[in-house]
Amino acid sequence: MIYLKINKPIKKGTLIGLDLASKSGYAIIKSSNKKVSLVSYGSININRHSNELLRLHNTATLLVRTINPFIISKNTLITIENCYLGKWNPRTYGFLSRLSGYIIPSIINAYRGILTINNFKLLYPSTSKKLVGLKGNANKQDSVNYVNNIINNKRLEFKLIHNNICDAVILALAGGFDKEVKKC
């Protein structure tokens, strides 16, 4: 368990951030009584050259298995990075939108009776960055630096290669902050 230095009020419960992509990052944060801790994080790398439906299914299956031990109550919020055009690659945009559309029902179905659509938030990358105090156009290195600054553990330091995990941490935190940011 890694304690995080957070200066804003945050929702109590389990906060899960999912940065969906060909290499999806996830972060699971527990918050209670002013203690906020990163309890699990990682990335799931799916073969880009396999059939797209198989990639969608495998990503959903692996994410459901990964978050399974942490979904124990209805007090869970899953924040997913919303699709955005980025450098405008239509194939990438199409895959990301289908992945989001596949993941949410897969998770709800796996945790029927615990989770509903109300346990999910979709945030654009710029919005999630603004919610944690970064600029909306912050680059990958800025995100990594932010996460390294809030980690209260000198033995753990994320590198640029871990940007998908850091984005997932930012998404989980942004979802848990009560204050919303104006539209980007």
Question: Can you say where each PLM-predicted feature lies in the sequence?
Answer:
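Phosphate- and other anionic-substrate recognition elements at nucleic-acid/protein interfaces
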Residues: 1-184
